[in-house]
């Protein structure tokens, strides 16, 4: 009986070890899909306009824009909205040019991470870039006022109450944890 239990236990451990590699590879596929999709969206004006508060307030990225941080608030557009004057401001700000470059970078990171299925060295480079990008994204929790519910008269505002933008940012902690583990 003891030998059968030991054999069963060893078989279970062997199966678990083999599924770990499958699980890591499935996560790589998921990162490819997500990063190529999000990177591709950076070529649409609404997405480029949507990241302006993050980039404009970041001490690490604001130099990509030509306008100062508080100015963007006057030129915000709702998703799907078009206003020629506001659009022109975004053209002059390099909103679209920066977003296109960021989109290419995000897609490349997704592809490198996916290629880790076939080449561990390439996958490690992709994972390292995901970590760097995710740390930059998480820095928005400190630099971007729009990630916290504003004080508009309610008692429900500030830390730890995240806005939609804040919730978008905080979910990157899961990506950071995966890639930190996958980089081992």
Feature locations, PLM:
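Juxtamembrane loop-transmembrane helix junctions in multi-pass integral membrane proteins
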Residues: 12-22, 90-97, 117, 121, ...
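Individual transmembrane alpha-helices with interfacial aromatic-anchor signatures
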Residues: 158-175
């Amino acid at each position: 009986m003891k030998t059968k239990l030991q054999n069963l236990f060893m078989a279970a451990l062997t199966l678990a070890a083999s599924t770990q590699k499958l699980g890591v590879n499935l996560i790589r596929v998921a990162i490819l899909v997500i990063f190529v999709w999000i990177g591709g969206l950076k070529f649409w004006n609404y997405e480029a306009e949507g990241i302006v508060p993050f980039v404009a307030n970041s001490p690490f990225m604001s130099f990509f824009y030509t306008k100062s941080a508080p100015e963007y608030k006057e030129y915000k557009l709702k998703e799907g909205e078009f206003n020629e004057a506001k659009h022109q401001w975004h053209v002059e700000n390099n909103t679209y040019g920066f977003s296109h470059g960021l989109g290419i970078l995000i897609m490349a990171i997704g592809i490198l991470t996916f290629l880790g299925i076939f080449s561990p060295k390439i996958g490690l480079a992709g994972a390292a870039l995901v970590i760097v990008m995710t740390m930059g994204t998480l820095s928005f929790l400190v630099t971007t006022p729009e990630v916290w519910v504003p004080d508009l008269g309610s008692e429900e505002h500030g830390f730890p109450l995240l806005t939609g933008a804040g919730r978008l940012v905080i979910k990157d902690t899961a990506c950071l944890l995966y890639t930190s583990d996958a980089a081992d």
